[in-house]
């Protein structure tokens, strides 16, 4: 008869909350908003005007929704053209697809102006 294999001792499983164990805190998710930028634009339009926190929250949500739509459409365009990078061209095309008529034209011209201003400095 062959000798029996040795039994290994059971390994204790670590259970959270045991003594001597340091618990890792869950990392905070950064919650970035556009509130300061919305406020700056508001002050450019009318320095005496104010905005309620509820209105600020609504405008911030609108901007986040638009950003998600444009990012998603840009990603689809990049995938469709088999490109690994989203360039200004994909973003410009996404703006034309997402925004209606005249709004798209103005958005494209303002975006082009901003990119030109950014690349000059």
Swiss-Prot record:
Region Disordered, residue ranges: 1-28
Q: Name one GO cellular component term.
A: nucleosome
Name the InterPro entries for this protein.
Answer: Histone-fold, Histone_H2A/H2B/H3, Histone_H2B
Keyword DNA-binding tagged: yes
Query: Where are the N6-acetyllysine residues found in this chain?
Result: 7, 13
Pfam families (UniProt xref): Histone (PF00125)
What quaternary structure, including any partners, is listed in this protein's UniProt entry?
The nucleosome is a histone octamer containing two molecules each of H2A, H2B, H3 and H4 assembled in one H3-H4 heterotetramer and two H2A-H2B heterodimers. The octamer wraps approximately 147 bp of DNA.
Question: What's the family?
Answer: Belongs to the histone H2B family.
The extra comment attached to this record reads: Phosphorylation of H2B was not detected.
Protein name according to UniProt: Histone H2B.6
Source organism per entry reads Triticum aestivum (Wheat)
User: Gene name, please?
Assistant: TH123
């Amino acid at each position: 008869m062959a000798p029996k294999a040795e039994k290994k001792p059971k390994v204790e499983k670590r259970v959270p909350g045991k003594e001597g164990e340091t618990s890792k805190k869950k990392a905070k998710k950064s919650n970035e908003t556009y509130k300061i930028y919305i406020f700056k634009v508001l002050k450019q339009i009318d320095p005496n005007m104010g905005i309620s926190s509820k209105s600020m929250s609504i405008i911030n949500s609108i901007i986040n929704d638009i950003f998600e739509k444009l990012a998603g459409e840009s990603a689809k365009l990049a995938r469709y053209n088999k490109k690994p990078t989203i360039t200004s061209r994909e973003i410009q095309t996404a703006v034309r697809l997402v925004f209606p008529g005249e709004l798209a034209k103005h958005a494209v011209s303002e975006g082009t102006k901003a990119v030109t201003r950014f690349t000059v400095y």
